[in-house]
Swiss-Prot record:
Reactions mediated catalytically: N-acetyl-L-glutamate 5-semialdehyde + phosphate + NADP(+) = N-acetyl-L-glutamyl 5-phosphate + NADPH + H(+)
Protein name according to UniProt: N-acetyl-gamma-glutamyl-phosphate reductase 2
Main localisation: cytoplasm
Pathway: Amino-acid biosynthesis; L-arginine biosynthesis; N(2)-acetyl-L-ornithine from L-glutamate: step 3/4
Role played: Catalyzes the NADPH-dependent reduction of N-acetyl-5-glutamyl phosphate to yield N-acetyl-L-glutamate 5-semialdehyde.
Amino acid sequence: MQVALVGVTGYSGMVLYRLLKQHPEIDRIQLYGHVGATTVALKTVAAMYQKETAVIRPFDATAIMRDNAIVFFATSAGITRQLALPFIAAHFPVIDLSGDFRLHDPEQYQRWYQRDPASATALAQASYGLADMPAPLSTYIANPGCYATATLLGLAPLAQQQLVEPTSIVVDAKSGLSGAGKRATAASHYVAVNDNLSLYKLNQHQHIPEMMQQLQQWWSAISAIEFTTTLIPVTRGIMTTIYAKAKSALTTTQVRAAFTATYHEQPFVQVLPTGMPTLKDVVGSNNCALGVDYNPVTNTIVVVSVIDNLMKGAAGQAVQNFNRYFDFAVTAGLPTLPVFP
């Protein structure tokens, strides 16, 4: 099978290219840019590609659909919206790592992304690809955001089984620097980040509406969540610590059983039998590791969800959705063990 990848210079695109190269069902990858009108050698993009013979072609929707079975967009928000319409019109398979088609409501996109949205008709063609909560997929798959993935996997059993007070959910999320993207800013500068923690986008993170959209599909009583994001001085990884009041007295064993029942058929979701996960448990893999606890003194359920933001939170989940769409083995081309030490 031949596949197309638009965007190989950002962190998610780099990881996705590596995963696609080692996928057993993929014979060839065609790379495309979205700026410029000339073909460039991949090896000129970064030193890591010096042995690569691939080239990056100018974007050409017609050529992509003619020569490939599917296209992956590893492009920034606002870019994919401008490129995707020919594929939507042709019902050509797309997996989109940007946030441009995750939200069903164009007004919500305008509010949270501060950009012009795709049309409501175009947005309606996309399905939200939370790969470990299988649902029917359309030809246009909107890959979830990294924070959204970690948070939703941590909340799904609580929401679907209505175990918590729906207005009591608090999420404290922490991410490594690669989640901020490749372009350096004052906030991501080494001097600002090293030996430091910094809260950002308090109650304003653009992944909030996609989380709410999915949570309300599971349980309409969830009207809002408190969600904070903190930048931490590590390269990769997301840890979300979730707090919610239980609807009735429980035990940790009962809470863990709810999670095990939800994920027992999902090879990439690990519910720990004891203790809490760390970033080292997942970085380099496509796994989500979950730890749970119940505090009877405060009647609070605590869930810790950890993922690699560039794998499960981006490229790995994109490949997982690719496997689902074409009915390949769910683990094909994906690492199930973390990189340790």
